[in-house]
């Protein structure tokens, strides 16, 4: 009973935070994620996943300046932030607030990555803001969800797993995976599933924030460090495939 009440409390808290000051979400199209009988399959890599998120009011960056500074980033993250390498994250349409936070974490060493750490260390605060705003303004292109795992991933994303005290992902990341600017929750739509699997495993193992106080590294660190440990390898695989196919 205590565990059940704890799960309900976590779900309710996540839902409230996700909707407090949240930007408007675009509802799924007819036959979308909540009602579709078939997985969300992208028409082609060049087809936009959906309109870009509104420019964040929380940064002082300039997208035009960020475009020039993103030339080096594109070698891994792809043109306009649409990475084609499944191990490297897509940045197109990602929250500027979230991107800026992660770059600062890489710069400080609170988040570890042998490639990103030295690159972020060379960035000024203005560089970080410019890059963050630029990538937020880009449009993520569509990817396919694996039909073998999509339905199970949809159920976990939309409803959670009460048996293991896992709240629904939708509460924080939104019905179409746009995230929540005000709360600092990242967009997940059209993200590479291989990358999502790695990040969830890194949360569970503590590798994402390896410092002595990982719960203080990021605003959403406490929640994800806890929840990722409750997910089975199959659940991680399923939900990662589902978000890859989101528009």
Model-identified regions with their sequence ranges:
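Inter-heme linker and motif-flanking segments adjacent to c-type heme-binding CXXCH motifs
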Residues: 82-83, 109, 137-148, 156-163, ...
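Gly/Gly-Pro-rich "capping" loops immediately C-terminal to redox-active cysteine motifs
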Residues: 56, 63, 67, 81-111, ...
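C-terminal capping alpha-helices of c-type cytochrome domains
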Residues: 121-143, 199, 226-247
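Electrostatic cytochrome c docking/interface patches
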Residues: 28-70, 84-85, 137-163
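The canonical Cys-X-X-Cys-His
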Residues: 73-80, 131, 166-177, 239
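N-terminal export/targeting leaders of redox proteins
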Residues: 1-60, 104, 233-234, 244-247
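Short amphipathic alpha-helical linker/capping segments at the junctions of internal repeats
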Residues: 125, 149-157, 216-217, 222-225, ...
């Amino acid at each position: 009973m205590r565990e059940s009440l704890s799960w309900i409390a976590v779900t309710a808290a996540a839902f409230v935070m996700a909707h407090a000051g949240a930007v408007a979400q675009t509802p799924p199209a007819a036959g979308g994620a909540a009602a579709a009988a078939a997985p969300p399959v992208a028409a082609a890599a060049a087809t936009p996943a959906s309109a870009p998120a509104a420019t964040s009011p929380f940064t002082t960056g300039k997208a035009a300046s960020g475009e020039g500074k993103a030339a080096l980033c594109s070698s891994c993250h792809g043109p306009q932030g649409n990475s084609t390498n499944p191990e490297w994250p897509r940045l197109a349409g990602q929250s500027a607030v979230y991107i800026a936070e992660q770059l600062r974490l890489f710069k400080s060493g609170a988040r570890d990555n042998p490639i990103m750490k030295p690159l972020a260390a060379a960035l000024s605060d203005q560089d970080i803001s410019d890059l963050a705003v630029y990538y937020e303004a880009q449009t993520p292109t569509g990817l396919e969800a694996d039909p073998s795992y999509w339905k199970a991933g949809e159920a976990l994303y939309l409803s959670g797993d009460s048996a293991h005290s896992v709240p629904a992902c939708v509460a924080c990341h939104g019905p179409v995976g746009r995230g929540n600017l005000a709360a600092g929750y990242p967009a997940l739509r059209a993200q590479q599933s291989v990358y999502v699997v790695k990040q969830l495993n890194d949360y569970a193992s503590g590798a994402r924030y390896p410092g002595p106080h990982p719960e203080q590294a990021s605003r959403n660190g406490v929640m994800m460090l806890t929840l990722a440990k409750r997910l089975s390898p199959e659940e991680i695989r399923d939900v990662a495939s589902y978000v890859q196919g989101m528009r």
